[in-house]
Design a protein with these regions (language model features):
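N-terminal acidic, proline/glycine-rich, low-complexity intrinsically disordered segments
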Residues: 1-5
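Membrane-anchoring hydrophobic helices of lipid-metabolizing enzymes
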Residues: 9-11, 15-111, 117, 125
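Soluble catalytic domains of membrane acyltransferases
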Residues: 91-244
Length: 244
C-alpha cells in the first residue's frame, strides 16, 4: 500500500500563487504577441503602398538615373519600416544584447554578411542592429516567396535576390536546370553594382533544430553544416565585395 503525505497548507498556498502567476504571465505574453503582430501588420500595410508604387514606376522608367533615385527612395522606406519595428520591439519586448564591431563599418561599402539561424526572430534582430549602420540587408529568398501577398511584392521592390533552388531529383530528371540558380543569382547581383549593399545569408540554409542537427550528423556542437555552394556563388557573383 502506497501512502501519500499531505502537502502542508503553506506549501499549497505557495504552489497556488506560482500557478496563478504563471497563468498571468502566459496571458500577458499572448497579449504582447498579438499586439506586436498587429503593429507589424499596420506598419507593413502602410509603407507597402509606397514600396509597391515606387517599384512599379522604377520598372517602367527608361532612364537609369531616375531608376537609381527611386531605388534610394525605396531603401529609405525600407529603413523607416525597420525603424518603426525597432520602436515597438524596444518598448514591448525590451531585448538586451551587446553588439561589437560596427566601428569600422559604414554605409558606403559592399558587405557579405553571414549568420547562423536560430528562430523566426533572427531577421528582426539583424535588421535592428544593422539598420542605418551598413547598407540595407538583402536576404537570399526562395523564389516562391515572391507570391506571398503584399510582402512578396515589397521584397521584389527592395531588390531582394530571389533564387530558384532545385533538388537533386529535379536536376537528375532535367539536367538543363543545372547552373540556372547561379545564373539567376548573377542576374540579381548586376543591379547591386549601382549602389552599396549588404548581402545577407543564413549559411546553414535553415533554422537550427536538434533533429536537423542529428540528421546531418553535424561536426559542430551548436550549428548545422554550412551550405558552401550558395556562399561560394555569392562571392563569385557579387560585383564588388569590401568586407565579410
Amino acid at each position: 500500500m502506497i501512502k501519500v503525505k499531505n502537502i502542508p497548507k503553506r506549501n499549497r498556498r505557495l504552489c497556488g500563487k506560482k500557478l496563478r502567476r504563471q497563468k498571468r504571465e502566459d496571458k500577458i505574453s499572448h497579449i504582447k504577441a498579438a499586439f506586436c503582430f498587429l503593429l507589424l501588420c499596420i506598419n507593413t500595410a502602410t509603407l507597402s503602398v509606397f514600396l509597391i508604387f515606387a517599384g512599379i514606376i522604377k520598372i517602367i522608367l527608361p532612364i537609369q538615373s531616375l531608376k537609381l533615385l527611386l531605388t534610394r527612395f525605396i531603401i529609405k522606406v525600407g529603413e523607416l519600416w525597420i525603424d518603426i519595428n525597432n520602436l515597438w520591439i524596444q518598448f514591448i519586448l525590451k531585448p538586451r544584447w551587446t553588439v561589437e564591431g560596427f566601428e569600422e563599418m559604414d554605409k558606403k561599402s559592399w558587405y557579405l554578411s553571414l549568420s547562423n539561424h536560430q528562430s523566426w526572430a533572427d531577421i528582426f534582430i539583424v535588421q535592428m542592429i544593422t539598420n542605418r549602420k551598413v547598407p540595407m540587408l538583402k536576404f537570399f529568398m526562395k523564389f516562391v516567396l515572391i507570391y506571398v501577398p503584399v510582402i512578396g511584392i515589397c521584397w521584389w521592390a527592395l531588390d531582394m535576390p530571389f533564387l530558384k533552388r532545385y533538388t537533386k531529383d529535379q536536376l537528375e530528371r532535367n539536367p538543363s536546370l543545372r547552373g540556372k540558380d547561379f545564373a539567376s543569382m548573377k542576374k540579381s547581383f548586376k543591379k547591386y553594382s549601382l549602389y552599396p549593399i549588404s548581402v545577407f545569408s543564413f549559411t546553414e540554409g535553415t533554422r537550427f533544430t536538434e533533429q536537423k542537427h542529428k540528421d546531418q550528423n553535424s561536426p559542430f556542437n551548436n550549428l548545422l553544416k554550412p551550405k558552401e555552394g550558395g556562399l561560394a556563388a555569392a562571392i563569385s557573383t557579387m560585383p564588388r565585395l569590401d568586407k565579410i
